[in-house]
Swiss-Prot record:
Catalyzes the attachment of tryptophan to tRNA(Trp) in a two-step reaction: tryptophan is first activated by ATP to form Trp-AMP and then transferred to the acceptor end of the tRNA(Trp). Could also possess an angiostatic activity. It is an enzyme of class 6 (ligase). InterPro entries: aa-tRNA-synth_I_CS, aa-tRNA-synth_Ic, Rossmann-like_a/b/a_fold, Trp-tRNA-ligase, uS15_NS1_RNA-bd_sf, WHEP-TRS_dom. It comes from the Eukaryota. It catalyses: tRNA(Trp) + L-tryptophan + ATP = L-tryptophyl-tRNA(Trp) + AMP + diphosphate + H(+). This is Tryptophan--tRNA ligase, cytoplasmic. It holds the Pfam family tRNA-synt_1b. It comes from Pongo abelii (Sumatran orangutan). GO terms for molecular function: ATP binding; kinase inhibitor activity; protein domain specific binding; protein homodimerization activity; protein kinase binding; tryptophan-tRNA ligase activity. Its EC number is 6.1.1.2. Keywords: Aminoacyl-tRNA synthetase, Angiogenesis, ATP-binding, Cytoplasm, Ligase, Nucleotide-binding, Phosphoprotein, Protein biosynthesis. The lineage of its organism: Eukaryota, Metazoa, Chordata, Craniata, Vertebrata. Residues 9-65 form the WHEP-TRS domain. It is found in: Cytoplasm. GO terms for cellular component: cytosol; nucleus; protein-containing complex.
């Protein structure tokens, strides 16, 4: 809602959001054009931001506003916090620097991954911390100290992460949780379960069941190409595994019984027009957090804690999971949260597989990578070479530099690039060239590994079985 209309009441805003939400859903259901849907979604986000600015809290479906919240939060640094919008489906901010993650930690009630925790992980594993930890890419956690306590006392835990297979080709941003999860599996030597939520994508997207399942299998090949240990990793499709495992389905039903419709409406913004499959799906994403969902691996034990590496937008699912866990007699899962991988056009939103120009795909050729980076990567450089040499570039908003923080292993080289670009010694074209030289071999090597993943290997990873780990 434009700022020039201060007469609009919070209740009117609330009703406008509900109406706009219905419009978005009807456009999606009616297979409207992408531009039309995107425009409606942007209007919905704008209305929600205006509501938060007026009320001091997020919009919640079926919770009409009472009196407006105090306006003391409208200070000089309030704007970015009010304009950050994060949920499992949408990530949006007006800041070129991206989401304010410190404020997101406060809003979500998680804990910052500080130097002390990173040092403790290093002591426990005897390994140098992964660059994602060193650089704050994994920046937030829930109960990681508890996992380390268990590990140091020789008590087991397992890893759980996942992928929503919405397309055949994955982009480089999708690799982030898997690169880090592989490192965790290697340094802690623990089993891993990977959920492919093909059922979710069928419910949310215009896909057939067969398409959703085929995407799950194709995406599994990219995940396997990250190098996971076949003896310690189980990848499963929800559409497959739900019918195979009574332990998994029993946990889904337990969770469903202990979470109300009102709770999921408050957490996820569901409305009366959403299909019942969407409303019950969070229980399916929650169930792998409990070890007896995998009796073939954990022998019906219920006391083995789970550690979930994921992007911060998935946290609402696991806040719900952690809330319900003690009520059904299970330990709460621990979490490690990552930042978002920005779109080529800037950090205002995360990279999307639906927009080919916003993404570097794992199927892209060396030429396509070069063209996309040179043509579309948002620059923090100046308008002219003379100005850039004099004033330097801005690494905080430059997408090429952001990508290097994810993929360039050498800390010293990254710091030198930062200094050279900030001082003006390095030009935007040179920075983009440095990124291209990192991305091209990384993706070519991934493609070579993926070619070696046969249908038989996928089947073995996706077959329920005992893993090579002895739980005492």
């Amino acid at each position: 809602m434009p700022n020039s209309e201060p007469c609009v009441s919070p209740l009117e805003l609330f009703n406008s959001i509900a109406t706009q939400g219905e419009l978005v859903r009807s456009l999606k259901a009616g297979n409207a054009s992408k531009d039309e849907i995107d425009s409606a979604v942007k209007m919905l986000l704008s209305l929600k931001m205006s509501y938060k600015a007026a009320m001091g809290e997020d919009y919640k479906a079926n919770c009409p506003p009472g009196n407006p919240a105090p306006t003391s939060n409208h200070g000089p640094d309030a704007t970015e916090a009010e304009e950050d919008f994060v949920d499992p489906w949408t990530v949006q901010t007006s800041s070129a620097k991206g989401i304010d993650y410190d404020k997101l930690i406060v809003r979500f009630g998680s804990s910052k991954i500080d130097k002390e925790l990173i040092n403790r992980i290093e002591r426990a594993t005897g390994q140098r911390p992964h660059r994602f930890l060193r650089r704050g890419i994994f920046f937030s956690h829930r109960d990681m100290n508890q996992v380390l306590d268990a590990y140091e006392n020789k008590k087991p835990f397992y890893l759980y992460t996942g992928r929503g297979p919405s397309s055949e080709a994955m982009h480089v941003g999708h690799l982030i949780p898997f690169i880090f999860t592989k490192w965790l599996q290697d340094v802690f030597n623990v089993p891993l379960v990977i959920q492919m939520t093909d059922d979710e994508k069928y419910l949310w997207k215009d896909l057939t069941l067969d398409q959703a399942y085929s995407y799950a299998v194709e995406n599994a090949k990219d995940i396997i190409a990250c190098g996971f240990d076949i003896n310690k990793t189980f990848i499963f499709s929800d559409l497959d595994y739900m019918g195979m495992s009574s332990g998994f389905y029993k946990n889904v039903v337990k969770i469903q019984k202990h979470v109300t419709f009102n709770q999921v409406k408050g957490i996820f913004g569901f409305t009366d027009s959403d299909c019942i499959g969407k409303i019950s799906f969070p229980a399916i994403q929650a169930a792998p957090s409990f070890s007896n969902s995998f009796p073939q691996i954990f022998r019906d034990r219920t006391d083995i804690q789970c550690l979930i590496p994921c992007a911060i937008d998935q946290d609402p699912y696991f806040r719900m999971t952690r809330d319900v866990a003690p009520r059904i007699g299970y330990p709460k899962p621990a979490l490690l949260h990552s930042t978002f991988f920005p779109a080529l056009q800037g950090a205002q939103t995360k990279m999307s597989a639906s927009d080919p120009n916003s993404s570097i795909f794992l199927t892209d050729t060396a030429k396509q990578i070069k063209t996309k980076v040179n043509k579309h990567a948002f620059s923090g450089g100046r308008d002219t070479i003379e100005e850039h040499r004099q004033f330097g570039g801005n690494c905080d908003v430059d997408v090429s530099f952001m990508y290097l923080t994810f993929f360039l292993e050498d800390d010293d080289k990254l710091e030198q690039i930062r200094k050279d670009y900030t001082s003006g010694a390095m030009l935007t074209g040179e920075l983009k060239k440095a990124l291209i030289e990192v991305l091209q071999p990384l993706i070519a090597e991934h493609q070579a590994r993926r070619k070696e993943v046969t249908d038989e290997i996928v089947k073995e990873f996706m077959t329920p079985r005992k893993l090579s780990f002895d739980f005492q």
